């Protein structure tokens, strides 16, 4: 069900891009303690079945096409184009399948972007990836190794993200795609809320820095108070030109999200877990969409005039 929340007017807002977030896998080489990428349901992840991937993308492209007046979302907002954002888990664990999906999405007229923890970005991969995406999203919660270890941002071999090497890869990405934009996602939690991330933001120079309060949809581990979250935001006021702040209420029922099994899914404020539709490639996007709750006004407020990829 698509709806406007109380206080949202009748005028249809417009966004340049409608962003569809497909979480292609739950698998990840990190074990972040507050990770929300945990979904119910059994079965093989859709990414590993090319026929189903193609059918899913065909359904999404047709249903969310800006000229599809049958989409109930068009009654509440308008948009000029579609962008497919691939997330995880860690989507680059399956980089060949990811690249194939990106290429197909672009062949259907969709824009493309990804969100990654950065650990699998190599020169060879960035040479293939950068020309396919308009934005590269990077999940980065701390510049401090001990905090990253505490959060769980460390792989099974004990390796942490090398920020210096990452910076070099990002420079290379720009040489492959001069129009590429960088977005950084930071989840404010009990371990990093006192950190000053200004130096690393100056080093990376993102076009957008999304600052999100840890969302208690799967676990309450490392939850942070409203006061501590707002203090983190205030500490980084000098970066307000690129900072986009989202508290928990802003993240409820306001993203277009598809899980690894090809279902629309959504979180609701004050509730644990997710609500799911049936698989989109099985019953079609139109039928699946009506099984699902979505706040068009909150979505439009986030994306209007903003260079963002979505939650990831």
Whereabouts are the PLM-identified features?
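Hydrophobic faces of well-ordered beta-strands that scaffold small-molecule active sites
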Residues: 20, 84-86, 112-114, 136-138, ...
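Alpha-helical scaffolding segments of alpha/beta enzyme cores, especially the outer helices
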Residues: 55, 59, 96-107, 124, ...
């Amino acid at each position: 069900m698509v709806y406007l929340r109380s206080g949202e007017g009748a005028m249809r807002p417009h966004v340049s891009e409608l962003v569809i977030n497909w979480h292609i896998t739950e698998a990840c080489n990190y074990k972040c303690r507050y990770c929300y990428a945990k979904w119910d349901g059994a079965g093989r992840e859709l990414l590993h079945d090319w026929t189903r991937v193609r059918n899913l993308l065909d359904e999404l492209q047709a249903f969310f096409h800006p000229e599809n007046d049958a989409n109930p979302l068009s009654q509440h907002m308008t948009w000029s184009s579609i962008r497919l954002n691939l997330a995880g888990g860690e989507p680059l664990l399956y980089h060949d399948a990811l690249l194939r999906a990106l290429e197909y999405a672009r062949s259907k007229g969709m824009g493309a972007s990804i969100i990654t923890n950065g650990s699998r970005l190599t020169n060879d991969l960035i040479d293939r990836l950068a020309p396919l995406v308009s934005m590269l999203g990077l999940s980065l919660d701390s510049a401090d190794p001990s905090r990253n270890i505490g959060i769980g941002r460390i792989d099974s071999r004990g390796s942490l993200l090398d920020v210096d090497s990452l910076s070099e890869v990002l420079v290379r990405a720009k040489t492959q795609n001069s129009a590429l934009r960088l977005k950084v996602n930071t989840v404010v939690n009990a371990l990093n809320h006192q950190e000053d991330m200004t130096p690393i933001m100056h080093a990376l120079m993102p076009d957008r820095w999304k600052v999100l309060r840890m969302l208690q949809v799967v676990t309450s581990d490392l939850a942070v108070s409203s006061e501590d979250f707002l203090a983190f935001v205030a500490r980084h006021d000098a970066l307000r030109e690129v900072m986009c702040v989202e508290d928990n209420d802003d993240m409820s029922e306001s993203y277009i999200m598809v899980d690894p099994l090809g279902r629309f899914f959504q979180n609701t404020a004050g509730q644990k877990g997710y609500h799911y539709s049936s698989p989109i490639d099985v019953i079609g996007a139109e039928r699946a969409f009506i099984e699902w709750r979505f706040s068009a006004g909150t979505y439009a407020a986030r994306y209007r005039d903003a260079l963002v990829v979505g939650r990831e």
